Amino acid sequence: MDKQNVQMNPPHPGTNLTGPPGHIGYPGPQAGYAVPPPGYASPGPVGFPVQHQPVTGHPGAPTQVPWMPAPLPPLNCPPGLEYLTQIDQLLIHQQIELLEVLIGFETNNKYEIKNSLGQRIYFAAEDTDCCTRNCCGPSRPFTMRILDNMGREVITLERPLRCTSCCFPCCLQEIEIQAPPGVPVGYVTQTWHPCLPKFTIQNERREDVLRISGPCVICSCCADIDFEVKSLDDKYVVGKISKHWTGLIKELFTDVDNFGIQFPLDLDVKMKAVMLGACFLIDFMFFEMTRGE
């Protein structure tokens, strides 16, 4: 028998395929299912979802900021500060409050604290009553509660009401850092100077550890403002706290501020937390002004 090359086209759904003599035929494909072209594998079983697929929101939905995975806490590390053992940089982003932008009503500040990869480490929320916020303005005393990814308060910042005039070297600004809440791990105290913003970082025993020095003029357009963190003898720069330029619109019409903190990777985690507290004190002292004043 001569062999002929016959190219068969896919049958229509519902028809039977003819086989060798004596066979009753093969059932055709079900209606509604396409027959794969020659050379392609047939589809697998239907009805089972594909596992381990990333879930994405619909277009226009707000993106969820990922949290930094919690590392194993080292010995003698206050609970919640183990995140700081693996980083040498923090990014602080203040959230925009619509009510404050529209009518100028001062609300409690909220911040996202992230690492250099954009992963959220902490969430900070101010806890101050309405009367104090709107009567004292940026000079107000406040309690800042810093939460981890489990919603636990791991750091508490306490700023008392102090004098804001540089002409009087008494009752200068100060902030206390507690980790965990109720256990002081350090302080940031203002050092009097007629022209420069200066601060001292202290440990829980109020012993001086580092110094902070800012520029003479706390004003800049389209550029960052750096506060250098130095050794006690002012010879070495070990880090800095930078107020980032957020853009002309935000700078003019809101008091939303973004900061960056850089410190040595091997710095004591307690001092890293104290530098975080210094950042909030600097924000309220120099950049938390109501727009239009």
UniProtKB/Swiss-Prot annotation:
Instruction: List the InterPro entries hit by this protein, alphabetically.
Output: Scramblase (IPR005552)
Q: Which residues carry this modification: Phosphothreonine?
A: T143
**Topology in membrane:** Single-pass type II membrane protein
Query: Could you tell me which residues belong to the region Disordered?
Result: 1-39
Membrane-spanning parts: 271-287
Lipid attachment in record (S-palmitoyl cysteine): C166, C167, C170, C171
Q: What is its main location?
A: membrane
- Record GO terms (molecular function): metal ion binding; phospholipid scramblase activity
Q: Name one Pfam family in it.
A: Scramblase
Q: Where in the cell is it found?
A: Membrane
Cofactors = Ca(2+)
Q: Name one GO cellular component term.
A: plasma membrane
Intervals, Extracellular compartment:
288-293
Kindly state which reaction or reactions the protein catalyses. a 1,2-diacyl-sn-glycero-3-phosphocholine(in) = a 1,2-diacyl-sn-glycero-3-phosphocholine(out)
Keywords carried by this UniProt record: Calcium, Lipoprotein, Membrane, Metal-binding, Palmitate, Phosphoprotein, Transmembrane, Transmembrane helix
A biological-process GO annotation: plasma membrane phospholipid scrambling
Q: Give me the Cytoplasmic side stretches, as residue ranges.
A: 1-270
Record remark: domains: The N-terminal proline-rich domain (PRD) is required for phospholipid scramblase activity.
**Role played:** May catalyze calcium-induced ATP-independent rapid bidirectional and non-specific movement of phospholipids (lipid scrambling or lipid flip-flop) between the inner and outer leaflet of the plasma membrane.
Q: Provide the family line.
A: Belongs to the phospholipid scramblase family.
**What protein name is recorded for this chain?**
Phospholipid scramblase 2
Q: Which organism is it from?
A: Bos taurus (Bovine)
